[in-house]
UniProtKB/Swiss-Prot annotation:
Its main location: cytoplasm. This is Peptide chain release factor 2. Belongs to the prokaryotic/mitochondrial release factor family. It holds the Pfam family RF-1. InterPro entries: PCRF, Pep_chain_release_fac_I, Pep_chain_release_fac_I_sf, PrfB. The keyword Protein biosynthesis applies. Methylated by PrmC. Methylation increases the termination efficiency of RF2. Gene3D superfamilies: 3.30.160.20, 3.30.70.1660, Release factor (1.20.58.410). Peptide chain release factor 2 directs the termination of translation in response to the peptide chain termination codons UGA and UAA.
C-alpha cells in the first residue's frame, strides 16, 4: 500500500474514533438494553403514543449502533483489501486495486455522513420535530407546491422508518393545500430538519395553466421542536379561546358530521392553531395544544435570540428565507442557496431523497455558528 493511502486510512481511523466517542457507543448499547426492556412490557401498548415512541427510538438507536459498528468493521477490512491487491499480478492486480480504492472512497463518504450526526448538539436538537408547511405566492400552483413539499418530507421520514403524525391539513379549493402541520417522531428529527426552515421556490410549467406558461411558486417551511414537560410552557386557561367546527377535505367538502375540528387562539399573542385529523374533538384539542405549546416555545426562543443579538449588535438572522430553488423547467436542478449543494435530478429529491441537502445544511449551520 502506498504511504499516502496509509496516511489517509489513518485519518479515517481518527475521524471514526472521534465519532465513536461523541456518539458514546457504550451509552448506545446501554440505551438499547433499557428500551428493549420497555418494549417487552405487555402493558406498553396500552399507551399507543408511548409505545410508538419507544419502538421508534429503539429502532433508531439500534440503527445508529449498527451503522458505527459496520463502519469500524469496514475500516478494519480495508488494509486487507490493499494487501490482497498487492499479492495479485497482471490485470487481476489492477482490478483488485480498483476495488480497494472504490471501497476507500465509499467508506470515507459514509464516515463523513456519520460525522454530521455529531454536529447536532443544540439545546433542542435531540427532540422530535413539528413541521408546518404553508403555501405562498403563486395561487393554485403554490398550493400544489406546498402539498408536493409535504409529500417529500413524509417520504423522507418513511424511508428512514420514522413515524409521521399529521395534526392538520387545510386543503385549497382547486388543488393542493393551504397549510399542513405534522410531527416526525424520531430522535434528532428537529436538529436534522430544522435546516429546512425557510422559503422553498419552485419553477416549472404550470399544469394548471391552459397556455402552459412557466410559473414560479413559493411555500414556507417551519420546523419546531416538540415540547416536553421539562419546558414548563404553562398556558392559563383564560388565555386560550376554543372554537369547534366540522372537518373539511379537498375542495372544502365536509368529511365529518360532527364538530370535531378544533381551533385554538392564544389571545395574548394572536397565535392560531387548528387540528382536524384526529377522530374526536378531545383528541384534536389535545393535539392542537401540543402545537400551540411548540409555537409559544419557539416565540420565547426568538425573543431570547433577539435580546442576545441586540447585546451583540447583531441585526439578527434571516438565513432561512429563500433557502432552496427547485427548477423543473427550462432545465432540471435543485440547489440550496446557502450551501451551494445541488442535485440535477429533482424527481428523486421530491421523492424524499434529501439526506445530501440535510447534511450540507447541518455542516453549513455549524460553520456559521462557529464564525
Amino acid at each position: 500500500m502506498e504511504p499516502d493511502r496509509q496516511a489517509e486510512i489513518a485519518a479515517l481511523d481518527s475521524a471514526l474514533t472521534t465519532v465513536e466517542r461523541v456518539l458514546d457507543v457504550e451509552g448506545l448499547r446501554s440505551r438499547i438494553e433499557k428500551l428493549e426492556h420497555e418494549a417487552s412490557d405487555p402493558k406498553l401498548w396500552d399507551d399507543q403514543t408511548r409505545a410508538q415512541r419507544v419502538t421508534s427510538e429503539l429502532s433508531h438507536t439500534q440503527g445508529e449502533l449498527r451503522r458505527v459498528e459496520e463502519l469500524r468493521r469496514r475500516l478494519e477490512d480495508l488494509p486487507v483489501l490493499y494487501e490482497l491487491a498487492a499479492e495479485e499480478e497482471g490485470a487481476a492486480a489492477g482490478e483488485a486495486l480498483t476495488e480497494a480504492d472504490a471501497e476507500f472512497k465509499a467508506l470515507r463518504a459514509d464516515i463523513e455522513a456519520t460525522e454530521v450526526r455529531t454536529l447536532l448538539s443544540g439545546e433542542y436538537d435531540e427532540r422530535e420535530a413539528l413541521v408546518t408547511i404553508r403555501s405562498g405566492a403563486g395561487g393554485v400552483d403554490a398550493a400544489d407546491w406546498a402539498e408536493m413539499l409535504m409529500r417529500m418530507y413524509v417520504r423522507w421520514a418513511e424511508q428512514h422508518k420514522y413515524p409521521v403524525e399529521v395534526f392538520d391539513t387545510s386543503y385549497a379549493e382547486e388543488a393542493g393545500i393551504k397549510s399542513a402541520t405534522f410531527a416526525v417522531h424520531a430522535p434528532f428529527a428537529y436538529g436534522t430538519l430544522s435546516v429546512e426552515q425557510g422559503t422553498h421556490r419552485l419553477v416549472r410549467i404550470s399544469p394548471f395553466d391552459n397556455q402552459s406558461r412557466r410559473q414560479t411558486s413559493f411555500a414556507e417551511v417551519e420546523v419546531l421542536p416538540v415540547v416536553e414537560t421539562t419546558d414548563h410552557i404553562d398556558i392559563p386557561e383564560g388565555d386560550v379561546r376554543v372554537d369547534v367546527y366540522r372537518s373539511s377535505g379537498p375542495g372544502g367538502q365536509s368529511v365529518n358530521t360532527t364538530d370535531s375540528a378544533v381551533r385554538l387562539t392564544h389571545i395574548p399573542t394572536g397565535i392560531v392553531v387548528t387540528c382536524q385529523n384526529e377522530k374526536s374533538q378531545l383528541q384534536n384539542k389535545v393535539a392542537a395544544m401540543r402545537v400551540l405549546q411548540a409555537k409559544l416555545l419557539e416565540r420565547k426562543r426568538i425573543e431570547e435570540r433577539a435580546e442576545l443579538d441586540a447585546l451583540k449588535g447583531d441585526g439578527g438572522s434571516s438565513w432561512g428565507n429563500q433557502m432552496r430553488s427547485y427548477v423543473l423547467h427550462p432545465y432540471q436542478m435543485v440547489k440550496d442557496l446557502r450551501t451551494e449543494y445541488e442535485v440535477g435530478n429533482p424527481a428523486t429529491v421530491l421523492d424524499g431523497d434529501i439526506d445530501g441537502f440535510l447534511e450540507a445544511g447541518i455542516r453549513w449551520r455549524n460553520r456559521k455558528d462557529d464564525d
